[in-house]
């Protein structure tokens, strides 16, 4: 509905240009907002005030002119001027009802799909030398939610799990794997079941034994030279490490697969060419033996130009080099229209520099959008980055185990007579959903406090509340199994029916914001408001005990669309729904 009003206003502006009211080259930014006070209509715009200077007219006069020139629309019941020149639109109830009716049988819930694009999404991307920890949670689940929403809206999405599968640390790890196998044979495989312990043990050997450190450095050289033995060890290590990652992905309900892995090592063959191409364009400068690029727009507080280091003095490459190679691949091979990077906000400067350099060096097409969608940190209740009681890094699998344990206690307390298998399944969904939703419901760019107590509450904007809200709506149909709705029509008469209908009609607008800005918290807020709107509707408007069949059937259709929207919205967040709790 919002996009429809924007379209009407765009047509009006074009008419003004043709009439000479506005300059022919004038470009207007049209903003349409939902009103908070329904006495002021459903939607409003301040367009008249924005056009005053260009049109040379006062805002109220211009507002009336806009209304007089608006194309006719069955969706608009009336239009009014308010205050200094706001234009308020009142949506026609029957047109809204027809829109909702059509949405019920549509797999996209009545959402008009945008022009499809090819969108590469770089997310999760853990280092394979260690197990996934809580620091990987935000990139993984925020990225996955945006990916799901992009696909639902018809875009071609290419997932890229840019894992850290290369670097000098692998010499140390391979040397330790080699040593363990010499001592214990294939039993050494068991040591890798705990990657953190394996990594610490390898690091200790590296620090304490000069002979071991020499062997580790030798293995790095041999690995980078393509040695078959080293590459075999490296592939085995990566395979075990990736298995750990995908166990976590499966538990989290994340859609990444092995086929989506395109790690740092995938770009090794192109790194030397990146350096040569930058040098050929005269962009490289020598600085203390390293090859760097200075860009005038990036300076420190003292006004000194900040370098992008492309190659170290010892010949080694850096993240920037790999990122440039990846951008070139994503532009020339994957033909991306947009590339989205879900990486910690602390990497903002790095991405600003490499995005700018990729464009400057023509490694990417000018029409390809490069977007760093950064996020804040997940903190403990002391406001500091989330740690174990001993100050260590919290493994993601341990966090999920605790969530499951706490959820099981919660579900059992509310269902003391439920069988253990059902309790366990409900607890699994509630526990994982609580962790994911607590994160996704926060503004992506904000830090947030992790609290099991808050996230497992049945009150407020939480996963348990929304899961219960869905079961409550779906439960209506368990008591209405013999009712035929094939010929039923939605009729909006009661104020709460209209409020619910208006909220349902906003789903498409919300999803557009999710994919345009990479902000799943907007969808979380919408689903919470939708659940509240349904609760108000259900209290004020009897469904199965309605006054007549026409009213009952209409309210059942509204309930059905609410259930469909809640379920789809939660699914786009990567959250399963339950039929009972």
UniProtKB/Swiss-Prot annotation:
Enumerate the subcellular locations listed in this protein's record, separating them with semicolons. Cytoplasm
**What are the GO MF terms of this UniProt record?**
arginine-tRNA ligase activity; ATP binding
Q: Name one GO biological process term.
A: arginyl-tRNA aminoacylation
Q: Which domain of life is it from?
A: Bacteria
Signal peptide span per the entry? none
Q: Write the record's keywords in alphabetical order, separated by commas.
A: Aminoacyl-tRNA synthetase, ATP-binding, Cytoplasm, Ligase, Nucleotide-binding, Protein biosynthesis
Know the name of this protein? Arginine--tRNA ligase
Classification lineage: Bacteria, Pseudomonadati, Pseudomonadota, Gammaproteobacteria, Alteromonadales
